[in-house]
């Protein structure tokens, strides 16, 4: 429930105690203190001094409790003439609509901001007119004028146009109030509203202390301290007279209070009230001195609490800035957990196989164990206290004037700014339309750089895939799903293009060549996407060459990254890891297909070489069925079933050839589920290749799984 002021029910226990003690002390002063000071003159003087102070304390307390310290931009919630629920729903609806427009097209940012600005101006004008009409009607009511003295906010220096413009640019959006608030506003959990320049929530007032009532609060503390000092001083004087002038006091007690009241009860009542006043002076005086230091340093109680909490959680001898830097590398820091693997920031980890996600706790790598229980990725099971499953609650920060005197106000302001930036309730007004995931994962990376990075990564993957397709058009072997050699040696093939380190390498790209050096020979590019079940979703490209297939000049800045692939070695009688040709070798092979011969050191079966004049026709000729079966099936001893895959024919393949290849694919698909097994060779430390086997009547699997 949103609380408008401190007098709104339910009342806090400390508020009731404060009001009760004030009333008892005032009654005790007029009944037991002033009449027994000594003479009528002293009595009238003390009453004349005490009464204004007590009235001032009463007025200031009522005023400080009755003032609504809420942010000016949410004051319409407390207007009785407006339906608060409807306004909140309208704000939420506008917030969602504007957010959806921003997500749909970045080009509408300026237009939506202009519309939002016009609507906010219109709403502010309507609110001002409504408040003015209400104030005019209340001017004719004397009781309303009297109450206005207690509820009007403090007179503070008005902000100039430059400051107002700066506050509007640095405004925040409260997700609980569904409204834009000022930069230094904070949402109070007790009052359930955003308080302008939040200082603290006072339980004795049952109200928040902010910009609108801070002057009244300081004045209340000063007046209360003076009132308690007068109360305690007069009480001490009365107690002294009770024990010094016994006969005189007995006569005065009988004259003022009657025969039923003696000297002992008077001493007890005066002594109790005096003790309460004295004991109340010390914490109140400390609080007033504490706020004097806050005013001198130019910070608020909230900033002091945030700074002290950061210093208490920091290691010994570390400042607030060093503690925050350590938090950035902790598992709970949003700056560390928000970075994605596809960013261009160079993550300090490489692709892993089947290990849990790595977490960096104070720059030390922590790998959680794979326990049966559910363990969050940001929690170290080996850390002490992790068995509780929840983080210990933050200890309350005690008020210490000595620590405040030594505190640097700049550090306190920076700590408060970081606390506001990391708040899940208050969001920057420029980013309030972004989804929560974007806000937590982008971090300090700008949106423009993220978009450009994603575009570079996509272009890099397309270029690498095209290079591999061009090289595989002359080779009947396809790269495997991955090998452990790639991970150990750091080389990356087609299988680990999505690893973080590989993505980082492929982010920096040179611009694509505009004028190719050789345009005489054009090749038909074939793009195919095959799943593990060999479905028939085959995509063919046209005869025209794609711009990504054009040959780059000799001064191209594209890096020739070494890639590996699993191929069959007839001499060794097993599959081995061999480097895939680089982009320059692919260009030479495509330009001079007749010069390519089988290597004796690393024999790799390739398509028969043809001259350049008949190269395109050779590509269009389909392979006979018996040759396809021979190439797809290995009949010797092997640790795997089957052999490499057959290449997908080009678009110009005749209909009869496509039918033969389709039959081969259907037979391969029926064999995969029957004979495919996933095992690992402990001798060669080689990962399995997911390739079909057992094709044909004469094929022999004959492999012994180790």
Curated annotation (Swiss-Prot):
The keyword Acyltransferase applies. Its EC number is 2.3.1.225. It is found in: Cell membrane; Cytoplasmic vesicle membrane. Belongs to the DHHC palmitoyltransferase family. Keywords: Acyltransferase, Cell membrane, Cytoplasmic vesicle, Lipoprotein, Membrane, Palmitate, Transferase, Transmembrane, Transmembrane helix. It comes from Arabidopsis thaliana. It is an enzyme of class 2 (transferase). It holds the Pfam family DHHC. It catalyses: L-cysteinyl-[protein] + hexadecanoyl-CoA = S-hexadecanoyl-L-cysteinyl-[protein] + CoA. InterPro entries: Palmitoyltrfase_DHHC, PFA4/ZDH16/20/ERF2-like. GO terms for cellular component: cytoplasmic vesicle membrane; plasma membrane. Residues 492-501, 591-603, 697-706 have a biased composition (Polar residues). The chain crosses the membrane at residues 16-36, 41-61, 220-240, 275-295. This is Probable protein S-acyltransferase 20.
